[in-house]
């Protein structure tokens, strides 16, 4: 997937990104005895003050969109697992084509309880299918942005949003551990 997507881009619709994902999965996931796991990390672009499609999304809107995406995946692929990965930290100077800044970072953090609440709700209606993955990368990148995120020039000075090679490897490890731990419990 490309950078810059929001939950709005993935809402269920014939022309939406989720339809493309579903079509691709149906092409390669032909052995129904194999576990199918979807890892979702959306929210960074939703939190922007201005810019990406649909932004800014407030917590209840974010929750509604994540739920719609999850419901569609569970409907299309009964028995699949959906693992939510908490979005990562970005600097309060983040302002490229889109304006994030301090308000965006504060909004991003209001999404975290929404993800956890959805996991709790699905544990009643779809036990063991919707799980919480990584919740630690946010704090890691907040502490290690100088070594793990790319310094970029923006409208409010230097900002840190996108992982560099080291950061991408670290983020991949956080997500892999999040998936492993979520699936190990269930």
Please give the residue ranges for each predicted region:
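Conserved SGNH/GDSL esterase-like catalytic core that processes O-acyl groups on lipids
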Residues: 1-64
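Surface-exposed intrinsically disordered loops and tails
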Residues: 6-19, 102, 129-133, 138-157
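Extracytoplasmic/secreted cell-surface and envelope-processing proteins
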Residues: 46-56, 91-99, 141-143
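Substrate-gating cap/lid alpha-helix
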Residues: 90-136, 165-170
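Histidine-centered active-site loop/cap adjacent to the catalytic His
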Residues: 152-186
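Generic structural signal for well-ordered alpha-helices
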Residues: 25, 66-71, 112, 116
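Active-site segments of SGNH/GDSL-like serine hydrolases
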Residues: 41-45, 71-110
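Structural recognition of the beta-strand scaffold that forms the well-ordered cores
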Residues: 1, 36-41, 46-48, 81-86, ...
């Amino acid at each position: 997937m490309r950078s810059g997507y929001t939950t709005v881009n993935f809402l269920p619709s014939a022309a939406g990104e989720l339809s493309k994902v579903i079509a691709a999965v149906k092409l390669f996931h032909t052995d129904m005895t194999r576990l199918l796991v979807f890892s979702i990390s959306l929210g960074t672009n939703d939190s922007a003050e201005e810019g990406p499609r649909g932004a800014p999304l407030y917590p209840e809107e974010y929750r509604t969109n994540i739920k719609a995406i999850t419901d569609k995946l569970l409907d299309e692929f009964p028995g699949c697992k959906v693992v939510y990965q908490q979005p990562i930290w970005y600097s309060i100077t983040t302002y490229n084509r889109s304006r994030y800044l301090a308000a965006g970072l504060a909004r991003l953090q209001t999404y975290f309880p929404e993800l956890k609440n959805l996991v709790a709700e699905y544990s009643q209606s779809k036990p063991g299918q919707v799980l919480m993955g990584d919740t630690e990368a946010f704090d890691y990148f907040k502490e290690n942005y100088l070594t793990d995120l790319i310094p970029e020039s923006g409208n409010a000075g230097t900002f840190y949003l996108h992982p560099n090679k080291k950061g991408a490897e670290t983020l991949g490890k956080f997500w892999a551990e999040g998936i492993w731990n979520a699936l190990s419990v269930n």
